[in-house]
Swiss-Prot record:
<dbReference type="GO" id="GO:0004045">
    <property type="term" value="F:peptidyl-tRNA hydrolase activity"/>
</dbReference>
<dbReference type="InterPro" id="IPR018171">
    <property type="entry name" value="Pept_tRNA_hydro_CS"/>
</dbReference>
<comment type="subunit">
    <text>Monomer.</text>
</comment>
<keyword id="KW-0694">RNA-binding</keyword>
<dbReference type="InterPro" id="IPR036416">
    <property type="entry name" value="Pept_tRNA_hydro_sf"/>
</dbReference>
<keyword id="KW-0378">Hydrolase</keyword>
<dbReference type="GO" id="GO:0005737">
    <property type="term" value="C:cytoplasm"/>
</dbReference>
<feature type="site" description="Discriminates between blocked and unblocked aminoacyl-tRNA">
    <location>
        <position position="9"/>
    </location>
</feature>
<feature type="site" description="Stabilizes the basic form of H active site to accept a proton">
    <location>
        <position position="87"/>
    </location>
</feature>
<comment type="function">
    <text>Hydrolyzes ribosome-free peptidyl-tRNAs (with 1 or more amino acids incorporated), which drop off the ribosome during protein synthesis, or as a result of ribosome stalling.</text>
</comment>
<comment type="function">
    <text>Catalyzes the release of premature peptidyl moieties from peptidyl-tRNA molecules trapped in stalled 50S ribosomal subunits, and thus maintains levels of free tRNAs and 50S ribosomes.</text>
</comment>
<keyword id="KW-0963">Cytoplasm</keyword>
<protein>
    <recommendedName>
        <fullName>Peptidyl-tRNA hydrolase</fullName>
        <ecNumber>3.1.1.29</ecNumber>
    </recommendedName>
</protein>
<feature type="active site" description="Proton acceptor">
    <location>
        <position position="19"/>
    </location>
</feature>
<dbReference type="InterPro" id="IPR001328">
    <property type="entry name" value="Pept_tRNA_hydro"/>
</dbReference>
<comment type="similarity">
    <text>Belongs to the PTH family.</text>
</comment>
<dbReference type="Pfam" id="PF01195">
    <property type="entry name" value="Pept_tRNA_hydro"/>
</dbReference>
Amino acid sequence: MKLIIGLGNPDPKYQKNRHNVGYMVVDKILENLRLKINKEKFSGIFVKTEEFIIAKPTTYMNLSGDFVKNISTYFKVSPNNILIIYDDMSYEVGQAAIKPKGGSNGQNGIKDILLKMNTEEIPRLKIGIGKNQEAAKHVLSDFTLEEFKIIDLVINQAAEAAISFLFNDIRIVMNSYNK
């Protein structure tokens, strides 16, 4: 069983924020696979098939850890079979990277997940949102029109990479999508 989780904030006012790029990728995955979220449990929403689960926490970004811990424990998904998709300020808009493990790099949602899961051995797909001196304000700002043209392409590529993760080893996905 594989589990893909896109991070974001549930309030509609944050829908187009940089911090919600994980949600945006999950929406694209669902669209590409012609699936719809149909379950709500563990403070999150998800769809489950026989092979995989695609999910979004319904807590705010910085409190994502309990959802990841609870859904992965309940469905017996090991950390190496989870892919967390989230925004990363250390990458420019238009950049993305898949990593098999690592620290939080200051991203509070992933920091909470690593704390609650008690491991850094969780694959992740980082989507660049650019840097700014005022981090809190920046992550809660919307992409500019020019940036959104770029991020839309990245969201499509990230969705393809995440779908590939459902059926392949993380190393294969990394070799195909990290360029």
